[in-house]
Amino acid sequence: MIYLDNAATTLHKPPEVAEAVKNAILTAGNASRGAHGVSLSASRMVFGTRSRLAKLFGCPRADHVVFTANSTEALNIAIYGLFSSGDHVISTDLEHNSVLRPLYDLQTRGVSVDFVPADRQGNIRYEDMETLFRPETKAVVCTHASNLTGNLLDIAKIGAMAHAHGALLVADASQTAGAVPIDMQRMNIDVLCFTGHKGLMGPQGTGGLCIRPGVELRPLLRGGTGIHSYDREQPQAYPARLEAGTLNTHGIAGLHAALKFIEKQTVQAIGAHERALMRRFYDGVKDLDGVTVYGDFSRSERAAVVALNIRDYDSAEVADALFADYDIATRAGAHCAPRMHEALGTVQQGAVRFSFSYFNTENEVDTAIAAVRELSE
């Protein structure tokens, strides 16, 4: 099978990831829940993973790296932890439902939300965002890259704009962490939300958020933390403030191994390889008769994603044919990005998304190009 659905999850991981998970299952105790050897060793591994993530993302403090099950949970913690009735939020049409649905829910609770519109290429105009700020604007919540088109937003520019208006920036790095360099301080990010199972090449069930010192988030969950057990309130210090209950220590061990792999290969090299494959595929399909490709490919810096349609064929039928006849795995449909499909005019048809990873090859890309060519004839 040729797996080209890496924007959903990376199927092929560094071999040391599975080995680390297996070893943790056999040897890891409950981190921060004991003073015996297996608990302490698990605690050291968890803190080591926080430290590697802080270094990777330019987060000023490792203890401000909070673990979650995925980026959806991280975004819910950030969104529900920041906003109250009377606040105003700015977001964009590029967002995933992990941002949209919490914001829609908050609209029913007295929070006002404005969305920066996207054009037919999936781009926004930053001057449109500038006009939306109000005195009560508390934050911009936006993705770093569209999971449908691969277009990047200029996060540093958005963060600077938000800060100039006294607002925060919450960035969703689900599609960029591990493949696009991120520096919270340089890019003016106040809260960075990420998942571990995509570009970071870790196990499913891992993710988190990095929080700039001085940013206060209300806990979404409350419960055991292993510290201050006689207090009725959740501990105030990060990370315990937002980490109630036992962590996914086994998954974090796999993420730790994946981060070591990324450090060795470098984010720059991983991203360059993925984008080269993406560009090879794009160049091979963009001029095919009957094929429509979505997104802006004029910039070299983007996520390694190509979304397309073939004539008026239902995207699900195309994806089914790719898998049944060519053994190529892709993703069809709405991709949890309804506003983006509205902007692109693909609500009814959806789109077929090809997404590339560090472990894909040029031969796999060429096979996928040939398959699209045959289906379009």
Give each language-model segment a name.
Residues 1-377:
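Pyridoxal 5′-phosphate
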